[in-house]
Each structure stands twice: as C-alpha cells, then as structure tokens.
Amino acid sequence: MKNIITPRVFIAATRQNDGKTTTSLGLLSAIKRYYPRVGYIKPVGQRFVDVEDHKIDEDSFLMDKVFRLNCPLPEMSPIAVASDFTRKYLKSSNNPKLVKRVQQAFDRVAWEKDFVLCEGTGHAGVGSVFDLSNARVAKILNAKVILVTQGGIGRPIDEVALNQALFEKDGVEIIGVILNKVRQDKVDYISEFARKGLERRGLNLL
C-alpha cells in the first residue's frame, strides 16, 4: 500500500447486525461536512450484487448511491466472499494476492480524497478462516478502529473486551466505542455506566 497519508478509520462491530452500516452512513454524512472528498471501502464483503460483471458488496453499492463518492465500485469492494470462496482458499491459499488486492484497492479509493471510511464485516475475528480477519485488515490498511456494539452494559462490554483483545493482538488501536440500539428512556443510564466500564478497559464511549 502506497498511501499512508490520507486520514482513515475502520468501522467494526462486536457482532453482525449491531448497526455498523447505519453507523457508517451517519459518519460519512458528518465527515463530508468537513472533508468534501470522501472515499469508502469495504475490503471484504459477504453479500453482494452484480454490477457490470463485478460482484459489488451491497454496502459499497449503497454508500456510492447515497453519497455519489466518485470512487470506482470494484475498488470499493475488492474481495467478494462467494459461497465457494473459503473452500477454494483452504485448498490453495493465496493470501499475499488478497492482501495486495486490498492495498491496491485502498490506494485507488483514496486517490485525491481527504478522508476514507473503511467498513469491516462483523466482529474482529470474521474472515480469520482465510487469514483476513477484520483485525488483520485494519492492520493492513493502517487504520484505527471505531467499534460498534448494541446498547446495554454487561454483555456489550464483555463483547467489546473480546474484540479488543483481537485488535490489540494485531497492534490495532480502538479509538472509541459507539453504543447502538439504546432505548431512548435508557440513554442517560446506560451511557453513564457503559462509559465507566469502557474506561476501565482504556476505551472511550463516543
């Protein structure tokens, strides 16, 4: 990867369906107020649509449609995990080729951009079977992480701790945690105690 200058952040979650894509939509909207030229990449995608003979991750397609990012769609979605992807990988590993694909895609997405938002797939360990876990991809992209988890205190912080261990193992910094799907009448209560629990782990509640 040649681009180590363009600011970037990697959005991950403690589990699937925690609201990572919704969070990414909100963050991109906010970021564009300060950085008009924003790029987006979902390095590893599991659900995709066919666009001009390319398999494009659904979230990449959505972001481009909403924000008109002026990024090449195939580079926003460099690796599409089809049903036979893992089986083929385990038969004949081609990890260096996949890593290079991710790096080159990022460089193209980041070209003449002020900021790039990178979105992961599920929790930190997803993708480990083909050696491209979210933690490793964040490391490859030299990106710090914002972790999204569901509202609550006990279980979310337990899950954050598990994910934190995986990211730290790869030397990736978590810059903050977003609590999603919190009931309106519980926001103040959960925020107070979740913040205390996260601070004990050296993490910030955003």
Language-model features, listed with the residues they occupy:
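Conserved catalytic-core segment of NTP-binding enzymes
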Residues: G120-L205
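N-terminal phosphate/diphosphate-binding loop that engages ATP/GTP or pyrophosphate donors
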Residues: N3, P7-D18, T22-R101, R108
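Generic beta-sheet signal
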Residues: P7-I11, K113-C118, V145
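Phosphate-binding/switch loop-helix module in NTP-utilizing enzymes
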Residues: T86-F130, A135-A138
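Amphipathic, non-transmembrane alpha-helical secondary structure
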Residues: L25, Q103, D107, I157-A161, ...
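Fold-independent oxyanion-binding glycine-rich loops
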Residues: A13-R15, P43-V44, M76-I79, E119-G122, ...
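Generic secondary-structure signature for well-ordered alpha-helical cores
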Residues: K32-R37, K65-P72, D107-W111, A165-V172, ...
